[in-house]
Regions:
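Detector for repetitive beta-architecture
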Residues: 7, 42-44, 50, 57, ...
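Right-handed parallel beta-helix/beta-spiral solenoid domain characteristic of secreted/periplasmic
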Residues: 63-130
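Acidic Gly/Asp/Thr-rich repetitive segments characteristic of extracellular carbohydrate-active
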Residues: 12-48, 52-57
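Short coil/loop residues immediately preceding or within conserved phosphate-binding loops
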Residues: 5, 25, 119
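Extracellular/periplasmic catalytic domains that process cell-envelope and extracellular macromolecules
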Residues: 1-4, 38-39, 63-67
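Boundary/junction segments of secreted and surface-exposed precursor proteins
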Residues: 2-12
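Aromatic side chains
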Residues: 8-9, 28, 53-54, 75, ...
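Glycine-rich loop at the start of a catalytic domain that most often binds anionic cofactors/ligands
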Residues: 60
Length: 130
């Protein structure tokens, strides 16, 4: 039996959101393309080394399983320049990625905010095994 895990590639360097994102040569260009997907257990999201995702955020709303987590990582882009081997991708939110969050109850102490606006480059919303 073959697995149906998918690997999605995102490259600000040489991607395009009209691509399917399923190979380095057909990488997406933005994180917004990933945000529109329904990820399944075992799927991987790989960001191209050297990419700077300006004004973008990654919102994962799906869950993996203990046996097949959803993985987020980095890869060397098709351009393959030696420079990129040591450079990790950057998500530069720059004021984007703001959500209103209400946990419905106070958390473990009154100093923790349980409702209000939060900002993050990566939001794991009701997700586990990432």
């Amino acid at each position: 039996m073959t697995n149906s895990f998918k690997t999605y590639y995102v490259s600000q360097i040489d991607g395009n959101d009209t691509n399917d994102g399923l190979s380095k040569s057909s990488a997406f260009a933005t994180l917004f393309a990933i945000n529109r997907l329904t990820l399944k257990p075992g799927d991987r999201v790989l960001l191209a080394r050297g990419s700077v995702f300006e004004g973008q955020f990654l919102q994962i709303k799906d869950s993996g399983t203990k046996e097949s987590p959803i993985e987020i990582g980095a890869y060397l882009p098709e351009s393959g320049e030696k420079f990129y081997e040591e450079v990790l991708p950057v998500i530069a939110v720059n004021g984007q990625g703001i959500w209103y969050q209400d946990y419905g109850t106070e958390l473990d102490s009154p100093t923790h905010v349980y409702q209000g606006y939060v900002s993050s480059a990566v939001l794991l919303y009701d997700a586990e095994y990432i």
